[in-house]
C-alpha cells in the first residue's frame, strides 16, 4: 500500500486513491480504519529500518571491489586500452600491476593503435626484443620526428616524410616526377632509418649513397626541429669519382643524361644544384611543416602540388587559403625563388572573365584584361588605405586589428555601369557563382596565348574559373624580388595553372596524391606561424 500511495501521490493517512475509486462507501470507510501497509511491506521496511522500527534508514553500502581482485586476464584487457604514456605510472601502483604490465599483449596493442604497426610482432621473439621494447625504445622515443619536414638545403629545400614502416622508422625524401611530367606520381628515396635489433637501444642508419645502410646519428635539437648526421660518409663515394656520382645523380634527379639537355643555362643550373646539395652528405637540419587546414568554403581542397618552373624543372608548392586570398608557398625552390617563399598569390575577390577562344590566343588581349584588373586593385588598395588612415584615429583601445590570415574588407569594385562588379562580393559568393557553369558541365574552353611558353603542352583545354593573381620573380640569388601580375586558372579539383604575364610563361600544377600521417596543424595559428618561419629562413 505504501508503494502504491507514493505512486498515486497521496499521503499514508488518505489511502490509495485507485483502491478507493473501485470500492463503495462502506468499503472505503473500512479501509481508512486499516493500517496503510500490508504485512509484506511491513517486513521489507522493517528489515531496512534501524532497530526494527518502521522508520527507514540508509541502505548499507555495496561491497567494495578492488582492481586487485579482478582476474589477470581482465586487467590485461583494461591496461591494453589505456594510452601507453599512462602505463608507467600504473606500474608504480603495486607489484601486481607491474608484473601484469610485462605482458606483451598490452604493448602489441599499443603499437598497433597508436603507431599503426600491423606487423606480426611475434617474430621479435627470435631476436629477444619484446613489444614493450619496440614501444618504449623506438616508437615512443622517436615519436617527435614523425610527420612532414623541410630540410635546410639553402634555396632548394625539400620534403621529408618520417613514418613508421613495419618495425622501422624511415625518413623518405619525396621528389617530384621527372620534368615535365607533372601528373606522374611522386618519387621517394630513403635517407635514414631507425630500428631495434637489440634490447639496449635503437639503431640509426644512414641510407644515403649506393653502398647500403651504414652508421648514422639523429639529434632532436628542439621542438619541431631535428638533425641527422652520417658517421661514414665514405659510403657515399663512388669508385668512378665525382663524374660518376654526378651522372648517377642526374639520372635519378632528371631522368636523363647531360647530353640530353641542350639548353646551356639549364645545364648550369643542374650542375650548380648537384655541387650545392652533395656537399651536405646527408648531414641536415629539418624543420617541421604542416599541411594547410581546410574549410568547406575553400575554392578547392588545399594541399601539396607539383608545378612546372621552366629551366628549374618541377617543384613542390603548398596551396593554402587565407580569407579572400589563396597562396602558393614553395616547399622546394631554386636560386631565383628559394624554398619557403610565396610564389603565387590569388585574389579571390577579382575574377577574370576570359574572352572567346579565338581572342584567348591573342596575348595582348589577355594582357589588357589583366592589367585593367590590376589597376582596379590598386585603386581599391589606395581607397582602403585612405579609409584605414581616417579610421585609425577613431579606433578604440579594445578594437583589434585584423590578422594576416583575415585581411581587411576591401571596397567592392564597380562595373562599367556603376553597379557592383562580379568581383566585389564575398569570396564564397564569387566561387559559388563561378562554379555554377562548371557543375552543369559547361566548363569554359581554354587555350594559352600564342607566345606563352609551357613546359607541358598537355595542359587541360577546359577550365572552371580564373582569378587575378600575382607571381614572385627575382634575379639569381633572390635579388630584386617583385610581384608581377598574372592569371590563376582553376582546371579541376586537382589541377590549376598560372600565366606569368611578364615572363610570358605558364606553370601547370598537379596535386600530390599521397596520404601523410602526423602532418595536420594543431591550429590555424600554428600553420600561419609555420609559414612565417620557413619564409624568414630565406628572406
From Swiss-Prot:
Database matches in Gene3D superfamilies: 1.20.1280.50
GO biological process: anaphase-promoting complex-dependent catabolic process; cellular response to oxidative stress; DNA damage response; mitotic G1 DNA damage checkpoint signaling; proteasome-mediated ubiquitin-dependent protein catabolic process; protein ubiquitination; SCF-dependent proteasomal ubiquitin-dependent protein catabolic process
Record PTM: Phosphorylation at Ser-278 by ATM following gamma-irradiation results in its stabilization. Phosphorylation at Thr-419 and Ser-480 in absence of stress promotes its ubiquitination and degradation by the SCF(FBXO46) complex. Phosphorylation at Ser-33 by AKT1 promotes association with CDC20 and ubiquitination by the APC/C complex. Ubiquitinated by the SCF(FBXO46) complex in absence of stress, promoting its degradation. Ubiquitinated by the APC/C complex following phosphorylation at Ser-33, leading to its degradation by the proteasome.
Domain F-box: 64-110
Residues that, per the record, bind Zn(2+): 206, 214, 230, 236
Ranges of Basic and acidic residues composition bias in the record: 377-397
Location of Phosphothreonine modifications: 37, 419
Compositionally skewed regions (Acidic residues) per UniProt: 33-43
Record localization: Cytoplasm; Cytoplasm, Cytoskeleton, Microtubule organizing center, Centrosome
Effect upon mutating residue 214 to A/F/N: Impaired folding, inducing the formation of insoluble aggregates
SUPFAM superfamilies named in the record: F-box domain
Motif window: D box: 64-69
Keyword line: Cell cycle, Cytoplasm, Cytoskeleton, Disease variant, DNA damage, Intellectual disability, Phosphoprotein, Ubl conjugation, Ubl conjugation pathway
Region (Disordered): 11-53, 377-446
Motif placement: DDL motif: 297-299
Entry-linked Pfam families: Cyclin_D1_bind (PF12014), F-box-like (PF12937)
Entry's free-text remark on domains: Zinc-binding is required for the structure of the protein and facilitate folding.
Family indicated by similarity: Belongs to the FBXO31 family.
Disease the record associates with this protein: Intellectual developmental disorder, autosomal recessive 45: A disorder characterized by significantly below average general intellectual functioning associated with impairments in adaptive behavior and manifested during the developmental period. MRT45 manifestations include mild to moderate intellectual disability and dysmorphic features, including coarse facies, broad nasal bridge, fleshy nares, and thick, prominent lips.
Protein name: F-box only protein 31
Organism: Homo sapiens
Gene: FBXO31
Amino acid at each position: 500500500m505504501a508503494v502504491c500511495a507514493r505512486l498515486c501521490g497521496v499521503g499514508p493517512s488518505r489511502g490509495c486513491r485507485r483502491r478507493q475509486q473501485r470500492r463503495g462507501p462502506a468499503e472505503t470507510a473500512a479501509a481508512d480504519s486499516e493500517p496503510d501497509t500490508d504485512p509484506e511491506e511491513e517486513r521489507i521496511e522493517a528489515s531496512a529500518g534501524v532497530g526494527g522500527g518502521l522508520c527507514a534508514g540508509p541502505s548499507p553500502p555495496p561491497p567494495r571491489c578492488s582492481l586487485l581482485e579482478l582476474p589477470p586476464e581482465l586487467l590485461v584487457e583494461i591496461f591494453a586500452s589505456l594510452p601507453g604514456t599512462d602505463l608507467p605510472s600504473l606500474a608504480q601502483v603495486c607489484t601486481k600491476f607491474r608484473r601484469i604490465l610485462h605482458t606483451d599483449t598490452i604493448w602489441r596493442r599499443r603499437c598497433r593503435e597508436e603507431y599503426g604497426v600491423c606487423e606480426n610482432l611475434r617474430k621479435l621473439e627470435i631476436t629477444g626484443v619484446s613489444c614493450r621494447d619496440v614501444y618504449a625504445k623506438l616508437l615512443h622515443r622517436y615519436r617527435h620526428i614523425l610527420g612532414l619536414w623541410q630540410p635546410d638545403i639553402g634555396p632548394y629545400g625539400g620534403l621529408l616524410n618520417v613514418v613508421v614502416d613495419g618495425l622501422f622508422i624511415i625518413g623518405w625524401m619525396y621528389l617530384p616526377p621527372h620534368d615535365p611530367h607533372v601528373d606522374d606520381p611522386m618519387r621517394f628515396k630513403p635517407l635514414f632509418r631507425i630500428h631495434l635489433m637489440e634490447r639496449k637501444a635503437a639503431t640509426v642508419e644512414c641510407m644515403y649513397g649506393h653502398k647500403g645502410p651504414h652508421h648514422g646519428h639523429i639529434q632532436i635539437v628542439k621542438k619541431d626541429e631535428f638533425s641527422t648526421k652520417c658517421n661514414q660518409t665514405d659510403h657515399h663515394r663512388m669508385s668512378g669519382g665525382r663524374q660518376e656520382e654526378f651522372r648517377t645523380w642526374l639520372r635519378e634527379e632528371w631522368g636523363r643524361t647531360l647530353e640530353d639537355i641542350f639548353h646551356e643555362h639549364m645545364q648550369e643550373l643542374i650542375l650548380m644544384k648537384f655541387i650545392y646539395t652533395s656537399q651536405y652528405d646527408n648531414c641536415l637540419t629539418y624543420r617541421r611543416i604542416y599541411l594547410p587546414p581546410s574549410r568547406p568554403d575553400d575554392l578547392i581542397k588545399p594541399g601539396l602540388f607539383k608545378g612546372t618552373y621552366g629551366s628549374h624543372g618541377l617543384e613542390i608548392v603548398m596551396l593554402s587559403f587565407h580569407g579572400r586570398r589563396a597562396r602558393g608557398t614553395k616547399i622546394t625552390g631554386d636560386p631565383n625563388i628559394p624554398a619557403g617563399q610565396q610564389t603565387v598569390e590569388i585574389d579571390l575577390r577579382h575574377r577574370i572573365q576570359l574572352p572567346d577562344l579565338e581572342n584567348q590566343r591573342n596575348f595582348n588581349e589577355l594582357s589588357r584584361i589583366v592589367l585593367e584588373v590590376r589597376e582596379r586593385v590598386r585603386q581599391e588598395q589606395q581607397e582602403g588605405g585612405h579609409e584605414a588612415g581616417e579610421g585609425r584615429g577613431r579606433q578604440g583601445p579594445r578594437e583589434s586589428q585584423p590578422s594576416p590570415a583575415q585581411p581587411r574588407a576591401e571596397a567592392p569594385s564597380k562595373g562599367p555601369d556603376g553597379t557592383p562588379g562580379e568581383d566585389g562580393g564575398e569570396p564564397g559568393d564569387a566561387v559559388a557563382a563561378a562554379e555554377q557553369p562548371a557543375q552543369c558541365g559547361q566548363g569554359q574552353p581554354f587555350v594559352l596565348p600564342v607566345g606563352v611558353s609551357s613546359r607541358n603542352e598537355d595542359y587541360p583545354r577546359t577550365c572552371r574559373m580564373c582569378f587575378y593573381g600575382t607571381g614572385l620573380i627575382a634575379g639569381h640569388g633572390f635579388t630584386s624580388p617583385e610581384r608581377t601580375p598574372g592569371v590563376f586558372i582553376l582546371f579541376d579539383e586537382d589541377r590549376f595553372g598560372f600565366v606569368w604575364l611578364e615572363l610570358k610563361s605558364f606553370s601547370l600544377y598537379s596535386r600530390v596524391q599521397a596520404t601523410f600521417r602526423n602532418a595536420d596543424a594543431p591550429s590555424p595559428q600554428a600553420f600561419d606561424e609555420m609559414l612565417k618561419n620557413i619564409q624568414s629562413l630565406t628572406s
